[in-house]
Amino acid sequence: MKGGTIQISWHDGKPVLTVDFHPISGLLATAGADYDIKLWLINSGQAEKKVPSVSYQSSLTYHGCAVNTIRFSPSGELLASGADGGELFIWKLHPSETNQSWKVHKSLSFHRKDVLDLQWSPDDAYLISGSVDNSCIIWDVNKGSVHQILDAHCHYVQGVAWDPLAKYVASLSSDRTCRIYANKPQTKSKGVEKMNYVCQHVIMKADQQRGDETKTIKTHLFHDETLPSFFRRLSWSPDGSFLLIPAGSFKVSPTSEAVNATYVFSRKDLSRPALQLPGASKPVVVVRFCPVAFKLRGSSSEEGFFKLPYRLVFAIATLNSVYIYDTECVAPIAVLAGLHYAAITDITWSPNASYLALSSQDGYCTLVEFEDKELGEAVSISVGKKPVDGEEKKHDLEKGDELMTETTPDESKKQAELEQNEESKQPLPSKITTDGKEKEHIMQKTDDEVMTETRHEEENQPLQSKVNTPVSNKPARKRITPMAIDP
């Protein structure tokens, strides 16, 4: 694995707020506070053992405000973009013999305030958006009209996700709730069923034991509106088995210090978390599953939490770091920290799992390239079939709603202090390397490498901002152990 922060003028030095890969061509789309959407071609650096680079392709200019979210449709024929002021456009691909161009296909107007997140339905026919006006809207893309309004939240809706099996949609808000909606079609007079999503679960609090007493108190599962991010982007697994929800804030006991966490929900029971991934020093703002499933390694000495016939890989981004997990291993398989000066805003995987991209408010993007079969051997997923019976955590989760963890406050403080100390010594490393003999990926860069890479970039990238990168020879390494919920 190699990667680094590509120090070019992505969006005229303004914050990059969102990124997404085209599901077919692999083009990278970025958007931000300069009102434009830009398309980039990724150039592999494996042959020369260098950090991957990008080549500018084109700009999509139509928005009059900062663009907060962009998402390609599953077919790759459409692109949706949401911006400040409620702007929401659908772009359509117009291929030609010489090039490919994107033109505005529809303008979806109803949101009164900023659109913060959106997600396509599996069939490209519908779109769900979340907004600062406290509502989610399901759009009929073909008609260009509102299909359904979900307005139960009482604060900003900062993340939305559409189940790949088309049964559920989920929304996450700064009102400290996550709402799960189930599709319960309504039958029209002509016998045609109309899609209709009804709130099935409101995830807000969990029971906690009060010392040795038999009484319990309820504690919030999510951060409140003081979380310093406009985004809480959640994600379904590509097979629909799991839902990852960021912005978790969990207390081991009612009097303990809150621990930042990501919650894993099983499709079999979406009313409460099946698993939590604690330990990050900063709040989690974005989660994203890799679209590719991988063959089981079968050689791990650690017992995993899920019985799946394949491995799923996912990335968790906090305000200042990224953790990469798979479903076969308890510990993260990679930790990336100290990459940006400002908060991370979005992450995305390439369709072939070769690249992971992330954007930041500091105006830069980071690209990570994985070597061939570094993540494993790809296998197919039969989306549309019922999730496997063994998708659940190995422990029995059916007996109670109590949320427990073995992580102590002292351990969490030590982890937070370690990460903060490492980041203060390494503000903006521009290269990520790994040692193939180690299980964890280690970010490290020598002074000679910095000088060589800086000279090379100055000669070959005229738009690049000339930034002297402080470097630490101390690896930024961190272990986080996910904890199952003890019923």
From Swiss-Prot:
Q: What is its main location?
A: nucleus
Quote the subcellular location field of this record: Nucleus
Keywords assigned: Chromatin regulator, DNA damage, DNA recombination, DNA repair, Nucleus, Repeat, Transcription, Transcription regulation, WD repeat
**Looking at the record, which segments are called Disordered?**
387-487
Pfam families in the cross-refs: Beta-prop_CAF1B_HIR1
Basic and acidic residues compositional bias: what residue ranges? Answer: 387-402, 410-425, 434-459
> Its domain of life?
Eukaryota
Give GO BP annotations, semicolon-separated: DNA recombination; DNA replication-dependent chromatin assembly; double-strand break repair via homologous recombination; heterochromatin formation; leaf development; meristem structural organization; nucleosome assembly; pollen development
Locations of Polar residues compositional bias?
A: 461-472
One GO term describing the cellular component: CAF-1 complex
Cite the repeat ranges for WD: 11-52, 62-101, 110-149, 152-191, 222-275, 295-335, 339-380
Under the heading InterPro entries, the entry gives:
CAF1B_HIR1_beta-prop, PTHR15271, WD40/YVTN_repeat-like_dom_sf, WD40_repeat_CS, WD40_repeat_dom_sf, WD40_rpt
Knockout: what is the outcome? Fasciated plants with broad, flat stems and disrupted phyllotaxy. Shoot apical meristem enlargement and altered floral development. Reduced heterochromatin content, more open conformation of euchromatin and dramatic increase of homologous recombination.
Instruction: Please explain the role this protein plays, according to its UniProt record.
Output: Component of the chromatin assembly factor complex (CAF-1) involved in chromatin assembly following DNA replication and DNA repair. Required for several aspects of development, including seedling growth and leaf hair differentiation. Plays a critical role in the organization of shoot apical meristem (SAM) and root apical meristem (RAM) during postembryonic development by facilitating stable maintenance of gene expression states. Seems not required to maintain transcriptional repression of heterochromatic genes. Involved in heterologous recombination.
The record's similarity note reads: Belongs to the WD repeat HIR1 family.
The record's note on quaternary structure and interaction partners says:
Component of the chromatin assembly factor 1 (CAF-1) complex, composed of FAS1, FAS2 and MSI1.
Q: What is this protein called?
A: Chromatin assembly factor 1 subunit FAS2
Species of provenance: Arabidopsis thaliana
Gene from which this protein is expressed? FAS2
